[in-house]
Amino acid sequence: MGRGRVQLKRIENKINRQVTFSKRRAGLFKKAHEISVLCDAEVALVVFSHKGKLFEYSTDPCMEKILERYERYSYAERQLIAPESDVNTNWSMEYNRLKAKIELLERNQRHYLGEDLQAMSPKELQNLEQQLDTALKHIRSRKNQLMYESINELQRKEKAIQEQNSMLSKQIKERENVLRAQQEQWDEQNHGHNMPPPPPPQQHQIQHPYMLSHQPSPFLNMGGLYQEEDQMAMRRNDLDLSLEPVYNCNLGSFAA
């Protein structure tokens, strides 16, 4: 007796329903992989559980490429067959399309951050790992490039500073040489001017004979001879003139 046809209906037991979902999902993904390998077809499979968890399978490492291709194809086909009265409907579909795309991007972002990985299959985890490795390679390459450019810029600035320092040192040495030469020249000039100057000429003071006649008369002793100290016996004025005649004249007047 052959096996009867099993009636499909919702499994009421939650545990049995979850177990059946896991088994059927694995079988479905296996069939999708087989058809992609045997027939060289691009397959994208998206499954949501009763709790809202997303399960997907794609032959391309990036699911978005297949979805974008599907969206372009279906949107272009709808545009060809849709009448003008369905413009509002098209806008609604466009909104739903963009909303689904945003949700997909948010989910991928969570995966890149290491979140919501429990529902991913080994192949999905492998694809995610490859994407992260590729991203890390690009990040390291860009970081090394920036570091290399920064080092080159610092070396260029260092070279410019060294050249500027060399130029300043050269200018300072030239200035020191000029100042040293000027100092030597000044020292030579000052040495020539510091020699003892010749004595200034004596200024001769000429006294008027009237002033000489009114000079105090020498002291006379009554009844004696004129006596005068030896140092005053001969006086000479600034004109080297002997005062002896004047004194003799004065003595003659007193004798009279």
From Swiss-Prot:
Coiled coil stretches, renumbered: none
SUPFAM superfamilies hit by this protein: SRF-like
Domain K-box: from-to ranges: 88-178
Cysteine pairings via disulfide bonds: none
GO function terms (MF aspect): DNA-binding transcription factor activity; protein dimerization activity; RNA polymerase II transcription regulatory region sequence-specific DNA binding
Domain MADS-box residues, every copy: 1-61
Main location: nucleus
Gene Ontology biological process terms, A to Z: cell differentiation; flower development; positive regulation of transcription by RNA polymerase II
InterPro entries cross-referenced by the UniProt entry: MADS-box/MEF2_TF (IPR050142), MEF2-like_N (IPR033896), TF_Kbox (IPR002487), TF_MADSbox (IPR002100), TF_MADSbox_sf (IPR036879)
Subcellular location field: Nucleus
Keyword Nucleotide-binding listed: no
Region (Disordered): 187-206
A single GO cellular-component term on record: nucleus
Quaternary data: Homodimer capable of binding to CArG-box sequences.
Record's protein name: Floral homeotic protein APETALA 1
Organism: Brassica oleracea
Lineage: Eukaryota, Viridiplantae, Streptophyta, Embryophyta, Tracheophyta
